[in-house]
Every structure is written in structure tokens, then in C-alpha cells.
């Protein structure tokens, strides 16, 4: 007890469970942000900034209550299935300026209902993973990817909600119709072009070539069969002609009178 009769702070009783609660609180603070990332306050919500950290894969220790996640300007090449399945409160996901080439069909499972913006611009996507993106209601940015303009891409775009601010920057890096290489995809589609019609024409030509091949084989076999039968018939006829003729035998019942 101090000189004034009051207890010193060090002598105050510690509430039951106090050290444990303090330890849990410290652990929660330490685990609230992935290593090498920053988690600033974002309007009272959890924001995780992992931009330009040299990451080669999506971190696994992202807090479950994250609302904004920035993974841009890294070296991520692949988004595996279930990479964000525990982030049910996520609203914005920035994966731009990476090296993403493949996206698993269930890469964004768990985000379909809440995600509002998905940025996949400036990556290495040649084809749109319709199974992964088709179920999302979020605005999607796909600009500056080396997309191959074909029927599958056109069909995938019909199911996506593209970000209107960047849709004009989606261009054909390669195309089934070479005249559209380097041109904005939306401009090509607005002109009335259908990459699917080219696909169907190619399929029809292949089918016609196959049918013609089978028809030619059948005709060849029929001609060979007819000629072989004619040759056999000719040989048989020559054989019959080569046989010696036999004189007719006299009828024993007939006698001279």
C-alpha cells in the first residue's frame, strides 16, 4: 500500500483470465495481416494490401473478414481451386499485373454472392475460364490479356459482366479471323462478326472431307469387286472353252431294220 493509503498499480488484483485474454488479443493482432502485407483501415472494414511483394501464389493466411484484397503487381501464375473460398465477405479482388495463365474452375468458389469487382487485367490469359467466372455477379476487368478471339471466347463473354470502363481495352491478340488481330474485341463483335460461324464452317468442311473420304473408299471397293468378278468370270469361260469336246454316244436301243 502506498504512502497515501492507496494501492499501487502493480498491486491491483488481476481479473481472472486476464493474461489469457491479453495473449489471445496479441495473437489475433499478429495473425490479422499476412506476412509482408499491410492491413490499413478501410472505412472500418478489413483491407489487405499485398501489392508488389514478389508473391508467386495466393497467401493462405488472409483474414476471413477481409473486404478488400489487393494482390496486384506480383508474380502469381496460377489461381488454384478454392483459393478464396473462406473469404465470404470479400467485395473487391485485385489480381492485375501478375502472370496469371490458368484459373481453376472453382478458383472463386464462395465469392459468387458478394464479390463486386474482380480485376484480372494485365495478365497472360489466352482463354476465358467460363466455369470460373460465369457464376460471378462482379464486374470483371480483362483488359491487356493476350486473348485468342474464337467461338469459345465469344460464348464466355456472353455470360460475364464486364467492367464498362475497361471493356474497350480488351483486344484480340490472336484470332481465327486474322483481320481482327490487334483490334478491340467489342468493336469486332459490334460490327456483327461471329467467331462461332467460322468455327462451324471449319467443322462442316472437316465433316465433308471425312464423308468424301469414306465415299471414295466405298466406290473404290465396289469397282475392285466388280473387276475381280469379271476377271474370274472370264477365266472360267476360257477354262470351259479349253475343255475337249466329246462326241455324242449312239443310242443302243435304236437299231437298223
Curated annotation (Swiss-Prot):
Classification via Pfam families: LRR_8, LRRNT
Cellular component GO terms held in the UniProt record: plasma membrane
Main subcellular location: membrane
Keyword Membrane set for record: yes
Entry membrane topology: Single-pass membrane protein
The name this protein goes by in its record: Leucine-rich repeat-containing protein 3
Native source species: Bos taurus
Transmembrane segments: 205-225
LRRCT domain ranges (all copies): 145-198
Residue ranges occupied by any LRRNT domain in the UniProt entry: 33-64
Cross-referenced InterPro entries: Leu-rich_rpt (IPR001611), Leu-rich_rpt_typical-subtyp (IPR003591), LRR_dom_sf (IPR032675), LRR_TM_domain-containing (IPR050541), LRRNT (IPR000372)
LRR repeat residues: 65-86, 89-110, 114-135
Keywords for this protein: Leucine-rich repeat, Membrane, Repeat, Signal, Transmembrane, Transmembrane helix
Gene: LRRC3
Compartments where found: Membrane
Amino acid at each position: 500500500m502506498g504512502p497515501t493509503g492507496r494501492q499501487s498499480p502493480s498491486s491491483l488484483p488481476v481479473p481472472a483470465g486476464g493474461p489469457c485474454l491479453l495473449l489471445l488479443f496479441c495473437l489475433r493482432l499478429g495473425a490479422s495481416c499476412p506476412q509482408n502485407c499491410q492491413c490499413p483501415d478501410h472505412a472500418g472494414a478489413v483491407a489487405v494490401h499485398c501489392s508488389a511483394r514478389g508473391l508467386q501464389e495466393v497467401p493462405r493466411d488472409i483474414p476471413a473478414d477481409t473486404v478488400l484484397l489487393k494482390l496486384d503487381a506480383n508474380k502469381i501464375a496460377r489461381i488454384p481451386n478454392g483459393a478464396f473460398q473462406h473469404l465470404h465477405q470479400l467485395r473487391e479482388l485485385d489480381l492485375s499485373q501478375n502472370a496469371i495463365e490458368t484459373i481453376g474452375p472453382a478458383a472463386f468458389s464462395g465469392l459468387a454472392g458478394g464479390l463486386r469487382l474482380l480485376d484480372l487485367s494485365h495478365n497472360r490469359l489466352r482463354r476465358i475460364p467460363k466455369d470460373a467466372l460465369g457464376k460471378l455477379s462482379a464486374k470483371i476487368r480483362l483488359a491487356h490479356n493476350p486473348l485468342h478471339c474464337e467461338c469459345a471466347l465469344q460464348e464466355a463473354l456472353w455470360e460475364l459482366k464486364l467492367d464498362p470502363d475497361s471493356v474497350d481495352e480488351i483486344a484480340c491478340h490472336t484470332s481465327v479471323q486474322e483481320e481482327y488481330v490487334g483490334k478491340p474485341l467489342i468493336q469486332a463483335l459490334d460490327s456483327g462478326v461471329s467467331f462461332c460461324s467460322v468455327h462451324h464452317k471449319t467443322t462442316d468442311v472437316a465433316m465433308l472431307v471425312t464423308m468424301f473420304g469414306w465415299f471414295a473408299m466405298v466406290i473404290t471397293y465396289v469397282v475392285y469387286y466388280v473387276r475381280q468378278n469379271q476377271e474370274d468370270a472370264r477365266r472360267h469361260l476360257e477354262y470351259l472353252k479349253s475343255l475337249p469336246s466329246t462326241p455324242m454316244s449312239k443310242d443302243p436301243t435304236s437299231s437298223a431294220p
